[in-house]
Curated annotation (Swiss-Prot):
It is found in: Mitochondrion inner membrane. It is a multi-pass membrane protein. The lineage of its organism: Eukaryota, Fungi, Dikarya, Ascomycota, Taphrinomycotina. This is Uncharacterized mitochondrial carrier C19G12.05. SUPFAM superfamilies: Mitochondrial carrier. Its main location: mitochondrion. It comes from Schizosaccharomyces pombe (strain 972 / ATCC 24843) (Fission yeast). Disulfide bonds: none annotated. One of its GO terms (molecular function) is citrate secondary active transmembrane transporter activity. Keywords: Membrane, Mitochondrion, Mitochondrion inner membrane, Repeat, Transmembrane, Transmembrane helix, Transport. It comes from the Eukaryota. Belongs to the mitochondrial carrier (TC 2.A.29) family. One of its GO terms (cellular component) is mitochondrial inner membrane. Solcar repeats lie at residues 15-93, 104-190, 201-287.
Amino acid sequence: MSTVAKTNPKSSNKPGPVKSIIAGGVAGAIEISITYPAEFAKTRLQLYRNVEGTKAKLPPFGLEWYRGCSTVIVGNSLKAAVRFFAFDSIKKSLSDEHGHLTGPRTVLAGLGAGVAESVLVLTPFESIKTAIIDDRKRPNPRLKGFLQASRIIVHENGIRGLYRGLAATVARQAANSGVRFTAYNSIKQSLQSRLPPDEKLSTVTTFLVGSVAGIITVYCTQPIDTVKSRMQSLSASKEYKNSIHCAYKILTQDGLLRFWSGATPRLARLILSGGIVFTVYEKVMEILKPF
């Protein structure tokens, strides 16, 4: 009996896979519902091409900025669920007997989470979202929503149409998760070490730590994100042979700074995103802890 009493508290402190999936899914859905306009602006700016010196333009703020939102809400909740489940699973397998994770192993866990979410969830949903946003620039847009856009893309391009830009998406998410989780865990552990063992970081502090992790992530990974968006545009199959060819054309035709196009709205989103996702995730995990 005494053995059971000692081991149960320890095991209950470790997040199970179901709890990670639920907490990650809830966090992802709430985050994108709040930050989607910034995602729309980022994607539109990344899809802009230099044509006779014209400047990139965004439509007046309104419902137009929520085109493709339903697609991303579903995709983001699934993505976050897969990301946190994968990260927690990999982290658990790489941790020492005290549950501690070294810096390099944290990076490895983050990279693994990024690859998992890219292949299983993100690429198809990102392809549909980007196609819907890109389609809105046309005189007579065809794509109206997630299901209808999915049918058209699959009908015209096959299943491979949903996986356009897979390599760039995997690279971006691996880099995103590697940088983001490493920054978040490093800062969090540093701050937590200054507190008593039984005291947790406040909600405000957790939000700020997540926001800082988001800022670091944006500037490290924006070039890959721009290539990904271009590879998932409606004209990608006619313009680019692969992600490397796409990056070369952006560099030679639009210049080096074009790789950071859309960085400002993405930064705005990830500052909020990092704070919202990690804060909601931690809170949901606390709520689920007794179960």
